[in-house]
């Protein structure tokens, strides 16, 4: 079977001149007059041979060559007369839907079905707002997803990326244009990805946003890009379509950015230069985190700090809020507690207060939950910018001391270096749970030893509950 290369696809990404200096990488490369990037829809298909030459697996090459065939636990029912229509009564929303359908056609992501009498599985196309104020077309595949075979997989996380970045390193970032749409859909699977608008029927020819297997598929295919890179010169972190490159030298970082751009071009990947940052940096935002590699610190981004302050102020002005808003509050604060010193510790009273008044298993999202003065006191800490911006270390601390502690139902003891301290429990204390006694032993040991403030101390105890409690604040 021969594949026809869409016109212009070979110019999907144009690169800076060969002699481009890393220090000059400040603006997107100029396009050659008369040439334009080809449609992004299924744009990797004509480049399957280049992926094969790169060393990608036979499975990856097969998907790129013939398209991704949906894998089902159970074949979904097909219909000839679709009842689901994406046309809207609201003229403003309907205009947006029509524009997005045309945009998807222009991108080569969907095609019009000429034989409307052929059976297919139909879903609804709707719009969700993007960060830049535009709209993202999303096909509601929630019903179709129930028929798909589950694909568990591992992808980069905030924790895994932070664990591998280095203090003093330099980075650049690359963002792909309409990332999922790069991947073609197999001819026989397109009938399951149909949508109707009025009298017209369309089906996706490229991987749509909203398919439950899309993150797995995209991550598995794009991981092959690393085969064309030297891991000794560049560490590449791929968080779906957001990529971060790390080098230990600024000059090498600029050169490796160019190397990766050339590799993307050769593989048919379309880079979004407006969202990419090719200038080597040590202070940057990535996946919702502000990194300062010069000092080796992590911070909440400015946008996330404003989001925290906004919702906290709303709660401080209120006597009660619906459970839905409480969940939003805890979710927003919880998303930042990793980057705020003692953030988890400061969030605990708010979580406990909410769960004492409302239970997910029995309560409704609309239930009004009172805001106590104790909760407001805890929230007041979160509204202080100085508490949110000291930063947390990127790397694990270097411990100056190691403290060994132990406790029983009669007393406690600890030693650090050549110093030893111990004590007996009072009549009231012996009634406490052993986990509380083990934790209290650590506190008493630190007070008795009177260590200088600002030190990092490694505490060794045989109580795993206490270890977890301290590490998780």
Features from the language model and the residues they span:
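Short, conserved non-catalytic motifs in the polymerase core
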Residues: 80-87, 136-145, 195-219, 318, ...
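Conserved pre-motif C helix in the palm subdomain of viral-like polymerases
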Residues: 104, 169, 180, 200-234, ...
């Amino acid at each position: 079977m021969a594949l026809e290369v869409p016109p212009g696809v070979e110019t999907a990404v144009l690169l800076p001149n060969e002699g481009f200096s890393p220090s000059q990488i400040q603006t997107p490369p100029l396009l050659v007059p008369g040439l334009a990037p080809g449609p992004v829809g299924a744009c990797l298909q004509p480049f399957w041979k280049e992926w094969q030459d790169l060393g990608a697996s036979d499975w990856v090459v097969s998907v790129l060559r013939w398209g991704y065939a949906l894998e089902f636990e159970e074949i979904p029912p097909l219909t000839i007369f679709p009842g689901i229509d994406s046309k809207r009564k609201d003229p403003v929303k309907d205009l947006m839907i029509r524009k997005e359908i045309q945009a998807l056609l222009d991108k080569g992501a969907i095609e019009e079905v000429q034989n409307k009498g052929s059976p297919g599985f139909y879903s609804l196309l709707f719009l969700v707002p993007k960060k830049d104020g535009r709209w993202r077309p999303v096909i509601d595949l929630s019903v179709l997803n129930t028929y798909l075979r589950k694909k568990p997989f591992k992808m980069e996380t905030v924790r895994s990326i932070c664990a591998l970045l280095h203090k003093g390193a330099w980075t650049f970032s690359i963002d792909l244009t309409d990332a999922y749409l790069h991947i073609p859909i197999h001819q026989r699977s397109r009938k399951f990805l149909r949508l109707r608008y009025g009298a017209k029927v369309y089906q996706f020819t490229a991987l749509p946003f909203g398919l439950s297997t899309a993150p797995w598929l995209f991550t598995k295919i794009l991981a092959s890009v690393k085969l064309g890179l030297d891991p000794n010169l560049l560490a590449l972190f791929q968080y779906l379509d957001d990529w971060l490159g790390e080098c230990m030298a600024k000059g090498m970082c600029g050169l490796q950015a160019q190397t990766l751009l050339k590799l993307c071009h050769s593989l048919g990947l379309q880079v979004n230069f407006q969202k990419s940052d090719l200038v080597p940096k040590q202070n940057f935002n990535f996946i919702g985190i502000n990194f300062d590699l010069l000092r080796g610190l992590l911070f909440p981004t400015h946008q996330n700090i404003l989001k925290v302050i906004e919702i906290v102020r709303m709660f401080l002005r209120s006597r009660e809020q619906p459970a839905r808003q409480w969940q939003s509050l805890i979710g927003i604060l919880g998303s930042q507690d990793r980057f705020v010193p003692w953030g988890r510790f400061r969030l605990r009273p708010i979580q406990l207060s909410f769960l004492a008044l409302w239970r997910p298993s029995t309560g409704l999202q609309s239930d009004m939950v009172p805001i106590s003065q104790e909760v407001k006191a805890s929230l007041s800490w979160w509204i202080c910018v100085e508490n949110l911006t000291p930063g947390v270390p990127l790397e694990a601390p270097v411990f100056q001391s190691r403290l060994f502690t132990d406790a029983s139902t009669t007393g406690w003891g600890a030693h650090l270096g050549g110093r030893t301290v111990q004590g007996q429990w009072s009549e009231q204390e012996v009634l406490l749970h052993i986990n509380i006694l083990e934790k209290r032993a650590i506190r008493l040991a630190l007070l008795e030893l009177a260590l200088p403030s600002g030190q990092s101390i490694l505490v060794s105890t045989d109580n795993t509950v206490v270890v977890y409690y301290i590490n998780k604040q």
